[in-house]
C-alpha cells in the first residue's frame, strides 16, 4: 500500500509516456505482487446520447488588450486574481478551462477561436480567458499561477488544478476538454471496484461486450485515445458497453488496477459473462477498434 500511496503523491511529470511496439504509446507504472484476477460475473449497460464536438475556426481572437473579440460571450474575461478565484468557486464541480494568453502571441490568437467554439458546444464546462499583458493585476495572476509560456491552459475542478498544457494544438485542446469534462456521454464513469461490480451485475443479460478503459488523470495517451472511445460508444451502443476508470482517482481505483494486473495505461479490459476475455494496451485507434470487433465475435484479419 505504501507503493500505491507514493505513486499517488508524485507530480504529473512522473507518469512517463513511452512508445510501445504495435500498441502505440502508453504510460507505465509498477506494482508489487501482480496476480491475474478473474473477478466479475456478467455484463451490459444503459446508454446516453453524446453529441460530438465539431470544431471550426471562427473570427474570434483574444484581440488587442482591453478589446473583447466578437461572438465569444461564453468565455469569461478575467481581469484579476480575485475575479479568477470567484469564477473557480462559482463553477463548483464543473470543469474550468482557463487560457492564459497575451495580445502579441500569434499562437494565442490561433487557438482562441477553437476555445470559443468549444465554449458554445460544451455547456457543462466553464471557459476563462486571462490576458497576461492587460494590467498589473493580470500579470500578478500569471505569476501566481506560474505561467511561463502562452498560450497556457489550466484545468480545474472544485477549485483544484487537475491538469495543464502549454503550446498545444486545437485537437489536443478538444481531447483534454472531452477527457476531463466528460460527464454525460454514453461512457459510464466508474469510481471504484463497487461501481465495476454494479455495472456488470446491472447488465447481467443481453450478451453485450463490456469495454473498460483504464487510465490515469495525467496521461497523454489516455487523453489522445478518449475521443475515439466516445465515438465508438455511440456507434457501437447496440452491442458494446463502454466504461472508464482513472486509477489515480482514489485508493479503491488503484487497488482495482493492482488486482487486474494493469501496469500500463491506457489498458482496455474486454469483459463478457463476468470474465475478462482479453485486453489491449495502447492508444492506437485502428488496433483498439480491431480488438473490440474481435472480442465482439467479428472475424478480424490483420
Swiss-Prot record:
Positions bearing the site annotation: Deprotonates C-terminal active site Cys: 213
Pfam families xrefs: Thioredoxin (PF00085)
Domain of life from the UniProt record: Eukaryota
Disulphides: 219-222
Domain Thioredoxin: 163-298
Record's subcellular location: Plastid, Chloroplast stroma
Chief localisation class: plastid
Induction field: By drought stress and photooxidative conditions.
GO biological process: cell redox homeostasis; defense response to bacterium; heat acclimation; response to oxidative stress; response to water deprivation
Single GO MF descriptor: oxidoreductase activity, acting on a sulfur group of donors, disulfide as acceptor
Chain positions of site Contributes to redox potential value: 220-221
Keywords: Chloroplast, Disulfide bond, Electron transport, Plastid, Redox-active center, Transit peptide, Transport
Transit peptide as recorded in UniProt: 1-56
GO CC, alphabetical: chloroplast; chloroplast envelope; chloroplast stroma; mitochondrion
Assembly and oligomerization: Interacts with the plastidial peroxiredoxin BAS1.
PANTHER family (alphabetical): THIOREDOXIN-LIKE PROTEIN CDSP32, CHLOROPLASTIC
Protein name: Thioredoxin-like protein CDSP32, chloroplastic
Gene behind this protein: CDSP32
